[in-house]
Amino acid sequence: MTQQLKFILTREEAASKGVSRPSDLVKLEEEAMILARAPISGVQDAVLGLASSDRIFLGVNVEFEGLPLHHSISAEQFLVANLALNFEQELHACLIPSRFYLESFEEDVPLLLVPQNNRLAHSDPFSAAEICSNPEHCSHLKCRALTAANKSNAQYSKCPSGVALICEGEVYGGWCIESAAYNLSLGPVQAALVDFMARGEGKGFEMITGAVLVEMNDAKVSQEATARILLKTIAPGCNFSVFRCHKTAEN
């Protein structure tokens, strides 16, 4: 039986593949490329990052069949989301095989990986009353989407948002990761799909059966329309719901 390819490698797993230092990351290039999903362009891309935990994280490009390429996830976006979703705070080195260079990072923690607490709560009192005492690990999409929104990095729009997906009883989450200029932002659905690909053992997007988006009441930038388009196309049987939230006062 072929071993399931992974998006995160421990130090021991990397060593078994002959990777013991940053310059060895190139040895993982072919394995990383296989994980890309590019049904439109056919161009597979990958980046590899060495985190402060000594784990190696993979990022690949993801295209969604039937949707314009601007809905896609770039390999760099995938890598950043993979790091953030796994609570890594430092990226020590990054190999970008398709552009043939190794970048080392010796400066402070990248802003996108700084943990956030947006102090959000559900605006609907019934929804607020249903939030579990341990929303990080419960199976309720409403709880998990709010938890994701609270981690959202929305430094430009000031409109944090989070998404939770469910497939065969397993919940996957993601949040908006904003950037500007030539660095494209990543929406909460795409970030949740990174989590789905990284932990979903190769399942297809069409197997996703439920999704919840949580975003601000008065958001000047809403994720709802984009989320509906994306989910309707890749997971036609998915039940999609939206809940509003507001920012609470600081303690």
Curated annotation (Swiss-Prot):
One of its GO terms (molecular function) is zinc ion binding. Substrate binds at residues 61-63. Residues 136-251 form the CMP/dCMP-type deaminase domain. GO terms for biological process: cytidine deamination. InterPro entries: CMP_dCMP_dom (IPR002125), Cyd/dCyd_deaminase_Zn-bd (IPR013171), Cyt/Deoxycyt_deaminase (IPR050202), Cytidine_deaminase-like (IPR016193). The active site is at residue 76. Belongs to the cytidine and deoxycytidylate deaminase family. Homodimer. PANTHER family: CYTIDINE DEAMINASE (PTHR11644:SF2). This is Probable inactive cytidine deaminase 4. It comes from Arabidopsis thaliana.
